[in-house]
């Protein structure tokens, strides 16, 4: 089969290669990939900022159909429509594993990072990571369950009450999903971007976000102040991984506000104003990926139409058209890009 592989570390080094079709082991299934999403981490990997176990087939956001069962698999059948968590293996013994926080296991191996992922015709997933797709969730939307689960995970680390003002920085796919999840909690939501984010900001309005703001044209601090009688935002979800946005997020928060870092920074060390965090008693939390408890709620949000993921898909390419996908994302033309396998 053909697979899109990160062949070695460094910038670039993506190639479509011929690989043997995988065979499911015990308690594993073989899935024929329908759609697989391009994640921000895939972009970071291509640019050499995000380490993976190269050579490895990338891809971890996907929907598909089970075509083969490994020994001992129960509860799933050939022909089932599924998606899978990104966890391929864990130690199963540490305190994080026993509490269901698989994303924090030091020995965890993830699809598309340490284990071959979904930028291929077939992918192997373990039974424990599988989720049936509800009838009301189409294959394109289902391929975005993983990023939606990530936003659910981040928002679960905060407390959003009806009427709270939530600022989401970064109108990429994660930001647009996070904004919709925040709306589902009853928050009044502002999503921010830059002048080259017009397509994404327009989409934010289409999916019902209260305010979609170009911060190069509008004084966001003044708007937040007007909406909160000078107090500031209750919650900031930083989804861009951009240092200026992170600094702005801290500045926009009210005293005792909540800040969640969701986006990945290109460089791991950044300057942060901890004096503001201290003086305003801001709660700061990091959010890494997702865990099993986030997946069924994410699928319910899709099935109940509280989140519209499909409308975020603007471009589709085959795995052999990576260059086109990359440039569509980097230019700001694309919102969400899905890839399809090739024979």
Curated annotation (Swiss-Prot):
InterPro entries, A to Z: ADH-like_C, ADH-like_N, ADH_Zn_CS, GroES-like_sf, NAD(P)-bd_dom_sf, PKS_ER, Zn_alcohol_dh
This protein's UniProt keywords: Metal-binding, NAD, Oxidoreductase, Zinc
GO molecular function, one term: D-xylulose reductase activity
Binding site for substrate: 146
Enzyme Commission no: 1.1.1.-, 1.1.1.14, 1.1.1.9
Annotated binding of Zn(2+), by residue: 39, 60-61
Nucleotide-binding is among the record's keywords: no
Chain residue ranges for the region called Disordered: 1-26
Primary enzyme class: oxidoreductase
Gene3D superfamilies found in the cross-reference section: Medium-chain alcohol dehydrogenases, catalytic domain (3.90.180.10), NAD(P)-binding Rossmann-like Domain (3.40.50.720)
Binding site for NAD(+): 174, 200, 262-264
SMART domains, alphabetized: PKS_ER (SM00829)
Disulfide pattern: none
Cofactor section: Zn(2+)
Record bears the keyword Metal-binding: yes
Pfam families for this protein: ADH_N, ADH_zinc_N
Catalytic activity field: keto-D-fructose + NADH + H(+) = D-sorbitol + NAD(+); xylitol + NAD(+) = D-xylulose + NADH + H(+); L-iditol + NAD(+) = keto-L-sorbose + NADH + H(+)
Cofactor: how bound: Binds 1 Zn(2+) ion per subunit.
Family recorded in the similarity comment: Belongs to the zinc-containing alcohol dehydrogenase family.
Subunit structure: Homotetramer.
Record's function text: Polyol dehydrogenase that catalyzes the NAD(+)-dependent oxidation of various sugar alcohols. Is active with D-sorbitol (D-glucitol), xylitol and L-iditol as substrates, leading to the C2-oxidized products D-fructose, D-xylulose and L-sorbose, respectively.
Name of the molecule in the record: Sorbitol dehydrogenase
């Amino acid at each position: 089969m053909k697979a899109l592989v990160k062949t070695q570390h460094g910038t670039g080094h993506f190639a479509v290669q011929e690989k043997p079709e995988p065979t499911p082991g015990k308690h594993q299934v073989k899935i024929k990939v329908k759609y697989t999403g391009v994640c921000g981490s895939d972009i970071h990997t291509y640019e050499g900022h995000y380490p993976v176990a190269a050579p490895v087939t990338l891809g971890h956001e996907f929907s598909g159909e089970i075509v083969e069962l490994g020994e001992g698999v129960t509860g799933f059948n050939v022909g089932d429509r599924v998606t899978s968590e990104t966890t391929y293996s864990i130690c199963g013994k540490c305190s994080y594993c026993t509490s269901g926080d698989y994303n924090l296991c030091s020995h965890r191996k993830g699809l598309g990072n340490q284990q071959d992922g979904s930028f291929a015709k077939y992918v192997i997933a373990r039974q424990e990571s599988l989720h049936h797709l509800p009838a009301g969730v189409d294959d394109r939307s289902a391929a975005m369950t993983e990023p939606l689960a990530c936003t659910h995970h981040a928002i679960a680390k905060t407390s959003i009450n009806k009427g709270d003002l939530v600022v989401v920085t970064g109108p990429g796919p994660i930001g647009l999903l996070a904004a919709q999840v925040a709306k589902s909690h009853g928050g009044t939501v502002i999503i921010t971007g830059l002048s080259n984010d017009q397509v994404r900001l327009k989409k934010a309005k289409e999916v019902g976000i209260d305010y979609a703001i170009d911060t190069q044209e509008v004084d966001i601090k003044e708007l937040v102040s007007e909406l909160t009688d000078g107090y500031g935002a209750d919650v900031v979800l930083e989804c861009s991984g951009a240092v200026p946005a992170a600094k702005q997020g801290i500045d926009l928060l009210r005293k005792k506000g909540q800040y969640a870092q969701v986006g990945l920074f290109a460089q791991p060390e950044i300057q942060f104003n901890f004096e503001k965090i201290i003086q305003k008693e801001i709660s700061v939390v990091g959010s890494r990926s997702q865990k099993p408890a986030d997946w069924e709620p994410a699928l319910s949000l899709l099935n109940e139409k509280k989140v519209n993921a499909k409308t975020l898909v603007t471009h589709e390419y085959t795995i052999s058209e990576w260059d086109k996908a990359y440039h569509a994302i980097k230019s700001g033309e694309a919102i969400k890009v899905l890839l399809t396998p090739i024979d």
